[in-house]
Amino acid sequence: MEAYINLFIKSVFIENMALSFFLGMCTFIAVSKKIETAVGLGIAVVIVQTLTVPANNLIYTYLLKEGALSWAGLHDVDLSFIALMACIGVIAAMVQILEMVLDKFFPALYNALGIFLPLITVNCAILAGSLFMIERDYNFSESVVYGVGSGFGWALAITAMAGVREKLKYSDVPAGLRGLGITFISAGLMALGFMAFSGIQL
């Protein structure tokens, strides 16, 4: 149990997708103008990560990995070279399902997220979760914890960024830095804050 808690904390703080690896920055910057929208997208990312990382783990372990098709008598078959395409396909399917659910049951959130919901499909943070899982050879339960943790870490980062940007509206920012300029500086300072966790060994 301790190993799973350590993995969760590590994926949220020490190896934060947005502020340690700088993944998913397009949506991170674009959707962090309001806290409500940022929280909505953060929840969507947590759900997609929680579903796709374990799903890709099962597909990789039982179909794509070298020797995974031994149950079918194909002992020497190695399909790991199509792991990237398989991960993208699973992510696209999960996002499509999530989009239909939000459109049906949460139309306000669906309209608020707008074009950025389909962009979760090509959000590199989502894909990185599955690729890191394969690279680090996590088992199924570890991939569930890692999926939840990495999604929650990204959601935490975008929510914090939205809070900072809402406060910046009332600040006297120099004219040349207004808009994206001060946003990138704020993101960099937040990343420096998260660097404090990098020395922690779990």
From Swiss-Prot:
InterPro entries: NqrDE/RnfAE (IPR003667), NqrDE/RnfAE_oxidrdctase (IPR050133), NqrE (IPR010967). The keyword Transmembrane helix applies. One of its GO terms (biological process) is respiratory electron transport chain. Signal peptide: none annotated. The keyword Membrane applies. Its EC number is 7.2.1.1. It is found in: Cell inner membrane. One of its GO terms (molecular function) is oxidoreductase activity, acting on NAD(P)H, quinone or similar compound as acceptor. Keywords: Cell inner membrane, Cell membrane, Ion transport, Membrane, NAD, Sodium, Sodium transport, Translocase, Transmembrane, Transmembrane helix, Transport, Ubiquinone. GO terms for cellular component: Gram-negative-bacterium-type cell wall; plasma membrane. It is a multi-pass membrane protein. The chain crosses the membrane at residues 11-31, 35-55, 81-101, 114-134, 144-164, 180-200. Its main location: membrane. It comes from the Bacteria. It catalyses: a ubiquinone + n Na(+)(in) + NADH + H(+) = a ubiquinol + n Na(+)(out) + NAD(+). PANTHER family: INTEGRAL MEMBRANE PROTEIN OF SOXR-REDUCING COMPLEX, NA(+)-TRANSLOCATING NADH-QUINONE REDUCTASE SUBUNIT E. Belongs to the NqrDE/RnfAE family. NQR complex catalyzes the reduction of ubiquinone-1 to ubiquinol by two successive reactions, coupled with the transport of Na(+) ions from the cytoplasm to the periplasm. NqrA to NqrE are probably involved in the second step, the conversion of ubisemiquinone to ubiquinol. Composed of six subunits; NqrA, NqrB, NqrC, NqrD, NqrE and NqrF. This is Na(+)-translocating NADH-quinone reductase subunit E. The gene is nqrE.
